[in-house]
């Protein structure tokens, strides 16, 4: 009986430690993928940092992307959510990616998800149209893209990809 109890305790401890290790490793992943019923692979690039283009500004953005692919083809719009950390207290009116050659890629359906003036942030949900997903991700990875945010008080802030975000995008490209 003692051997059975000891064996049972060892099995439980192995299961608990392996599940903890699995969840710990999953939390470290910068890009998550999942197979969808549509037979496409869904990619989720976890929030990565974008720094203010104006180095003196006390602001940054944490941005994430969620989209689907069929092999090498992007087959869905990208849900592009971001949290802007600044002390403006203003709502986000619009946002767009500025690419080389003065090309502007709008983020549509801007919806406020959360806002806290005391903590200095606002979180929004947006849509990046399917035909621009690959172009924007590549431009962000190559530092050829700026996120421009217009606030309802008329101010505009611009953000560039940090090395952290570039690493996340590169990981998504490799999956």
PLM region spans:
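Sec-dependent N-terminal signal peptides
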Residues: 4-13
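A generic "folded-domain core" signal
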Residues: 20-175
């Amino acid at each position: 009986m003692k051997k059975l109890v000891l064996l049972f305790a060892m099995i439980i401890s192995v299961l608990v430690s392996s599940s903890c290790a699995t969840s710990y490793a999953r939390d470290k992943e910068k890009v998550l993928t999942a197979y969808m019923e549509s037979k496409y692979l869904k990619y989720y690039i976890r929030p990565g940092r974008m720094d203010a283009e104006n180095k003196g500004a006390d602001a940054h953005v944490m941005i994430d992307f969620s989209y689907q692919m069929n092999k090498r083809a992007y087959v869905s719009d990208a849900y592009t959510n971001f949290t802007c950390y600044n002390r403006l207290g203003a709502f986000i009116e619009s946002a767009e990616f500025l690419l080389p050659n003065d090309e502007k890629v709008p983020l549509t359906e801007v919806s406020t998800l959360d806002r806290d003036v005391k903590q200095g942030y606002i979180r929004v949900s947006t849509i990046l149209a399917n035909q621009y997903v690959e172009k924007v991700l590549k431009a962000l990875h190559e530092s050829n893209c700026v996120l421009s945010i217009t606030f309802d008080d008329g101010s505009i802030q611009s953000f560039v990809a940090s090395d952290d975000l570039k690493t996340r995008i590169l990981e998504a490209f490799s999956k």
